[in-house]
Amino acid sequence: MAVVFDHPKSLLDVSTHFCPGCGHGIVHRLVCEVIDEMGIEGDTIGVVPVGCSVMSYNYFGCDVIEAPHGRAPAKRTNPDKFVFSYQGDGDLAAIGTAETVHVGTRGENIVVIFINNTTYGMTGGQMAPTTLPGQVTQTTPFGRNVETAGYPIRICEMMATLSGTALAQRVAIDSVPHIREAKKAIRKAFENEKAKRGLSIIEVLSTCPTNWGMSPTESMQFVKDKMIPYYPLGVYKDVTAEEGAKA
């Protein structure tokens, strides 16, 4: 009998600390499936920051290092390795905004996996830079008021304006078709790194049932009904498409 699905070899066979319904497990699997398919586990280095994914070094089979809060994409060494950072919105879009922007201006040849769940997960559900207008959090109990808290940051749209960005794409994991599309995007990002095209950033709209106060099923519906309308899915920059159009 043909094997149509198996546990990724580069994803360690251990229990994770993630909450039930959290999207990190899905994204971890997708990243590791791509690493396995490309046969690059021995040449891959992951960088994880402060946040819910801080213990991902226990789950990825490749080499993984930790970075101070927000500093994961501050990378310049080992150009022969496949390097990816795995960051949340409180990390990448808040304290790490400078590093995020300048990794794009420098065109560093790395992959950034950006998990957008509109909240600070590890610290208890405070407002994040990506929290939706009107969304209730621990620090916005009456909903995010844009007059006092400003507007959410649309990272992909911002990163697409930078010359060193090769790929900026937003995906989601609220449905099987969207999960498949997310894997394709992650694969393309790693292929870009292999071809040394520059920075590839994949933003993943994900869930945080615990801090949202929802069930896993309700959380997936929230992504579909609330997050995707505000953060439209799609490719915001793709240098390979631009090169093809010029050919």
Across the structure, where does each feature detected by a protein language model lie?
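Short, hinge-like loop/turn segments at secondary-structure boundaries
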Residues: D63-I65, V103, A128-L132, E218-Q221
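Short coil/turn connectors at secondary-structure junctions
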Residues: V14, I40-T44, N78-V83, R106-V111, ...
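Flexible, low-complexity linker and terminal segments
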Residues: M1-V4, P8, D13-H17, K194-A247
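Active-site-proximal loop->helix
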Residues: T97-H102, M122-V136
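Glycine-rich beta-alpha junction loops
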Residues: V50-C52, N117-T119, S175, E203-N211
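Thiamine diphosphate
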Residues: M1-G121, K184-K188, A195
